[in-house]
């Protein structure tokens, strides 16, 4: 049975959520400009969009923008802790918008929400035209659903939750098993209708590129994460704002003078390290990439291995997009009152499950998303958001102005997919947004900051080989 009614924590929070949305409108000039430019033409009319992205106030304004462009929406969060319940309540009152999201979902509830957001119409195998994804969970569910349905059809083999490596995988496989027993063609039928997905984050893009390389993509994917106006703004400036916000709300510890270890010096790591340095911390970086490592050194940071610094650090932050970055052996060596958190998308950068199941430890919940673990040696360490995104679990994520950049890119990606649904422009591969749209997103935000652009004259344009209106850089240019 298809769930056609929103499921949120408390609908009475909607008025407060709407007020927060109104306040944030002024901080999201890009989205507001898109509404002005495109709203009248309803370019997304009749489009069915499933979103799996953090259900925050800023996300509510993205949903409202897509709705104002004519789309029908079904939405869930991409993290069990990241929903702002007042935002979910507010946006669920909009026409043609159905929301399945609340803070502190269980893993079973989380995957139920993802499945519900992907299931449209009277039949349970009627899905969306397009997906807005963050981390790739909605895309993963469709692809794994098709894979297991094929296995069931050919070999009568069902997903086996007993073979799961962890609790989340068990929930995921249980959902797919039940789904196949109920309708063995559900995900195959849903996948056939999907035009494409626009992916928000590094981890999700990594998943997509793996599938692309193995020719396993079932539909087009647009890589929003690597748009310059996403990667260099959301990833850097967003994390520079929301990491200290999350740490301070969670711990109330002074950061100045402390040793902060940032694992990873990509764009997210750069933003994190910058914020910690600005607060007076002594910042150490761990890196696998010599280019990123030398960038860190040139910015004045110490680059070390985790083994060198693990017993000295006061704060440990992972932001690599990899797995098992901080292992159980590292956690057991940390000094008393060390704080451990993650700002990468998934919870497997830190071996939290291994720690919480380790014999001889004692777990105390200090407050929501803050656990104090007594180790066998008597030291106590503090784990934030159980290894999930601490900036969304312990705070409210990136500020609206930064998210306006990212969500403009998401909107343009959805428009591009929908407008080209009957053309042969895209194959089942991963694509970047074109440069002129990147520049357009930046232009939308300059006025808000009272910035003025210099205009090239005809001679300068001819010399550079560019148009007055851009694009001004080649695709190979590294900002």
UniProtKB/Swiss-Prot annotation:
UniProt KW Lyase keyword: no
Binding site for substrate: 56, 134, 200, 230, 234
Single GO BP term: S-adenosylmethionine cycle
Residue(s) at site: Important for nucleoside inhibitor binding: 59
Binding site for NAD(+): 201-203, 235, 264-269, 287, 322, 343-345, 391
Principal EC category: hydrolase
Keyword field: Hydrolase, NAD, One-carbon metabolism
MF-aspect GO terms: adenosylhomocysteinase activity
Pathway: Amino-acid biosynthesis; L-homocysteine biosynthesis; L-homocysteine from S-adenosyl-L-homocysteine: step 1/1
Subunit structure: Homotetramer.
Similarity field: Belongs to the adenosylhomocysteinase family.
Protein name: Adenosylhomocysteinase
């Amino acid at each position: 049975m298809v769930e056609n009614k929103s499921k949120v924590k408390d609908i009475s929070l909607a008025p407060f959520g709407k007020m927060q949305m109104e306040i944030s409108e002024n901080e999201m000039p890009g989205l507001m400009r898109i509404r002005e430019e495109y709203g009248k033409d309803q370019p997304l009319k009749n489009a069915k969009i499933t979103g799996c992205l953090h259900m925050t106030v800023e996300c509510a304004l993205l949903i409202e923008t897509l709705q104002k462009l004519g789309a029908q929406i079904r939405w869930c969060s991409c993290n069990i802790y990241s929903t702002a319940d007042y935002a979910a309540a507010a946006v669920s009152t909009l026409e043609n918008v159905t929301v399945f999201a609340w803070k502190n979902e269980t893993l079973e509830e989380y995957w139920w929400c993802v499945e519900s957001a992907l299931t449209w119409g009277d039949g349970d195998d009627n899905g969306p035209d397009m997906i807005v994804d963050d981390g790739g969970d909605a895309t993963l569910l469709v692809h794994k659903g098709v894979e297991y349905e094929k296995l069931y059809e050919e070999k009568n083999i069902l997903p086996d939750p007993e073979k799961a490596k962890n609790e989340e995988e068990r929930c995921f496989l249980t959902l797919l098993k039940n789904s196949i027993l109920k309708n063995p063609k559900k995900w195959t039928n849903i996948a056939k209708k999907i035009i494409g997905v626009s992916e928000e984050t590094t981890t999700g893009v990594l998943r997509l590129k793996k599938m692309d390389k193995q020719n396993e993509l079932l539909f087009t994917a647009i890589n929003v994460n690597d748009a310059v106006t996403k990667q260099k703004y959301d990833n850097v400036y967003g994390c520079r704002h929301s990491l200290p916000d999350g740490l301070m709300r969670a711990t109330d510890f002074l950061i100045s003078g402390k040793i902060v270890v940032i694992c990873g010096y990509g764009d997210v790591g750069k933003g994190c390290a910058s914020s910690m340095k600005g607060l007076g911390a002594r910042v150490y970086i761990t890196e696998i990439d010599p280019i990123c490592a030398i960038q860190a050194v040139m910015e004045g940071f110490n680059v070390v291995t985790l083994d060198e610094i693990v017993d000295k650090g006061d704060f440990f932050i992972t932001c690599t997009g990899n797995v098992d970055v901080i292992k159980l052996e590292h956690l057991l060596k940390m000094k008393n009152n060390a704080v451990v958190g993650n700002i990468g998308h998934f919870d497997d950068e830190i071996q939290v499950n291994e720690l919480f199941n380790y014999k001889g430890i004692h777990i105390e919940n200090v407050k929501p998303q803050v656990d104090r673990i007594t180790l066998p040696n008597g030291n106590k360490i503090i784990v934030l958001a159980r290894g999930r995104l601490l900036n969304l679990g312990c705070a409210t994520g990136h500020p609206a102005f930064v998210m306006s950049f990212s969500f403009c890119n998401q909107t343009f990606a959805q428009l591009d997919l929908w407008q080209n649904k009957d053309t042969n422009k895209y194959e089942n591969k991963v694509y970047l947004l074109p440069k002129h749209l990147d520049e357009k997103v930046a232009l939308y935000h300059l006025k808000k900051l009272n910035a003025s652009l210099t205009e090239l004259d005809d001679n300068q344009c001819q010399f550079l080989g560019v148009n007055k209106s851009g694009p001004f850089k080649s695709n190979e240019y590294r900002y």
